[in-house]
């Protein structure tokens, strides 16, 4: 089974053995809705939204651990939706399937492929192995709405940019 964007989510669930009723229940769940809305679950807010308390009146922080050639200025937000909660939902949803197939999507209940877009090389990426959650996350990361994801040093966005109907994969 193949899919792009939302089709990657549905296709991956089917490939993992979910029934249509199971999929509907999952997609209507509050956890899943919270994931794509960008709202951080209350129990995680402390870890992601709170600053570490310090005795300083104010502070300025610099980090030189990355060389200047890798410097990427962040003047504008890269997405409308904060991806933290979505990433947590996807880890919970896809971790067992990734572990059981050992990263080979041919070993899922139904062999699976999804399409993502290589931002810099302007071509489709056929995701056939690796972390299933990352592959699906890349395939459904609609530009400006969701932050792109880096997989194997490739920045990946929504697969619908180059192949919205992947019947040729």
Q: What does each model-identified segment do?
A:
Residues 10:
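Acidic, glycine-enriched active-site microenvironments
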Residues 1-4, 13-169:
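Patatin-like phospholipase
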């Amino acid at each position: 089974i193949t899919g792009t964007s939302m089709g990657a989510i549905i296709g991956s669930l089917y490939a993992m053995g979910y029934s249509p009723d199971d999929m509907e229940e999952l997609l209507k769940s509050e956890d899943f809705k919270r994931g794509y809305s960008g709202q951080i679950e209350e129990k995680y807010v402390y870890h992601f939204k709170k600053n570490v308390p310090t005795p300083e009146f104010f502070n300025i922080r610099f980090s030189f651990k990355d060389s200047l050639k890798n410097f990427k200025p962040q003047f504008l937000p890269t997405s409308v939706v904060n991806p933290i909660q979505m990433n947590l939902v996807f880890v919970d949803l896809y971790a067992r399937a990734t572990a059981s197939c050992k990263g080979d999507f041919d070993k899922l209940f139904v062999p699976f492929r999804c399409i993502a877009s290589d931002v810099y090389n302007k071509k489709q990426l056929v995701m056939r192995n690796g972390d299933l959650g990352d592959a699906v996350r890349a395939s459904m990361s609609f530009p400006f709405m969701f932050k792109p994801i880096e997989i194997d040093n490739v920045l990946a966005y929504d697969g619908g940019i180059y192949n919205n109907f992947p019947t040729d994969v």
